[in-house]
Design a protein with these regions (language model features):
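Active-site and donor-binding regions of nucleotide-sugar-utilizing enzymes
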Residues: 1-134
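Short boundary motifs at domain starts and secondary-structure transition points
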Residues: 15-16, 67-69, 181-191, 221
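A short, charged/proline- and glycine-enriched loop
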Residues: 19-20, 72-73, 186-197, 201, ...
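Short, catalytically relevant binding-site loops at active-site mouths
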Residues: 32-33, 37, 202-205, 236-239
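A nucleotide-sugar donor-handling region in carbohydrate enzymes
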Residues: 114-196
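Catalytic donor nucleotide-activated moiety binding site of glycosyltransferases and closely related
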Residues: 199, 224-244
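Surface-exposed cleft-lining segments at the edges of enzyme active sites
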Residues: 199-211
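Signature of uroporphyrinogen-III synthase
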Residues: 210-218
């Protein structure tokens, strides 16, 4: 289950090339079409915009997924648990959670009064909450961007992106770069920068205020040579960083 190129990339470096060939990807139209069309097998959900439509979608998917995708119960499930379709696809099956950004390090409490209706209508993950707190999440793969919340430490494994990437075969690395349309010239240009800031939609997700987000980035980039800084903006991040 993927919605961002970030999580997709992490999944690809965590598995072998033969596993990639046999993976069925559940995604939404948030994942760029140029990437989706290169996936070996996938289903793209067109997610509703209105709030009550989104609730109906989650209920509908939870009850129809076993009929539409019967192979799920026999599969190893990877991905994030914070997508609109996560609970309906993962259901009560074991899930290996793959980092999707800073939200994995900031657990959001779910209203306990809604546990039973959510559990009945939308599944275990919807009832328990996101970030790996559900008992169906057996393992959490994180890169260590921030300290891991105590609640999920016991089932969290920290891995190095660089080490995982270097262990891949050259042919598989080339295939991954092709999937994301990464050209050799672009990689050479990126390598000329000293620092890269990958932004996150923290304001859009209601995690912090705009002022706090900017202060966080300023702290992270303190002492950084801005002429050698590359900013990679998250697809859902609406901030124009050229103004700051």
């Amino acid at each position: 289950m993927v919605e961002t190129v970030y999580t997709l990339f992490l999944y690809l470096i965590l598995v072998k090339e033969e596993d990639f060939n046999q993976t069925f990807f559940f995604c939404s139209d948030a994942l760029p079409e140029l990437v989706r069309c290169k996936l070996p097998h996938h289903h793209c959900f067109k997610l509703p915009k209105r709030r009550w439509h989104r609730w109906l979608f989650r209920i509908w998917l939870y009850y129809t997924a076993p009929l539409r995708f019967p192979f799920i119960k026999q599969s190893h499930i990877y991905g994030s648990d914070n997508y609109l379709f996560s609970s309906g696809i993962a259901r009560s099956y074991d899930l290996i959670l793959v980092e999707d950004g800073l939200s994995n390090y900031s657990l959001i409490q779910v209203n306990s009064l809604l546990y039973k209706p959510r559990r009945i209508l939308m599944g275990q993950i919807a009832a328990e909450g996101c970030g790996g707190v559900s008992p169906t999440v057996k393992k959490i793969m994180l890169t260590g961007l921030l300290p891991v919340p105590a609640l999920i430490q016991d089932k969290t494994e920290i891995f190095s992106v660089i080490n995982k990437w270097n262990r891949l075969s050259s042919s598989y690395r080339t295939r991954i770069l092709s999937l994301f349309d990464c050209l050799a010239e672009e990689l050479e240009e990126i390598s000329s920068y000293q620092d890269i800031l990958f932004t996150q939609p923290m304001v859009e997700d209601g995690l912090i205020t705009l002022e706090d987000e900017l202060n966080l980035y300023r702290t992270l980039l303190a002492g950084c040579n801005q002429s050698k800084l590359l900013i990679k903006v998250h697809p859902r991040d609406t901030l124009d960083y050229s103004k700051f």
